[in-house]
Amino acid sequence: AVEVSRTGMLSRVANLILSLGEWEDFQVFSVDPKPTQRFLFDMGVRPMSRVRVSNRGIEPLEGSEEEWEPPAISRASLSVDCRDAYGKRTPRGEIRFATLTDLGDGRSPGKLGSIRISMSPGREPESFIHELERAVGWMDPDVLLTRKGDVIDFPALLSMASSSGQALRLGRMRRNLVLRRKAITNWSYGRLVRSEAYHALEGRLHVDMGSSFIGKEGGIEGLMELSRASGIPMQDLSRLSPGSAISAIQIRQSMEDGVLVPWKKNRAEDLKDGREMILA
């Protein structure tokens, strides 16, 4: 086994090992699990499970085989009205107002109603951003839901914040909004597919229901269920395709069974002789 000091070095070390053997002499296993998935597995916990945090670390309070019920987590929706001259919502449009709505916790309806923050003529962007941050902090949702938030709402708010030289702090940790991944395009089953940028919050979850297939089909409860089964945090899982979510579940199950997972398992299988076929 090869240990690395930082998870970000894992793929580089794996590529180095393979290249030393001219990509033929060595096999590499267990590189695929995401750092968060590996960390939660090592801690013996799953997303959305109850834990105790103490000086001794993180202790699970429930077993994986126990009957599980989705927890009640508070939710709020955020929508930014930013339209161009043709009335189309776009991140480059002028922000007129933002609406924050309490959606309850999945068991009972919201009691805090809606807050509308207007960008009136002559108002400074700094004042608008500060009021939005205060509203989110006061409502304090566990999950912030948007529709096209990764594509429109957050880019528009970030543009306004940067124009006034300030940060956008909508998470509980009071840190700047994190751009975890820029928009990328790749080929999938013969089609060119675009994966939108990923804007993450710290201390609360951002789920873009306008871009998440799993979120649209299964709702928040479905995301929680899949998150628990796969070991992938809900905020990350909402950006995955169904196929990637299934792969994550398989990897988690392999880790639990103590089975090594070949790296790049979608690579064409090497030729085997008769003896290898019998052993396999």
Q: What is the role of each PLM region?
A:
Residues A1-A280:
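The two-metal-ion catalytic cores of nucleic-acid processing enzymes
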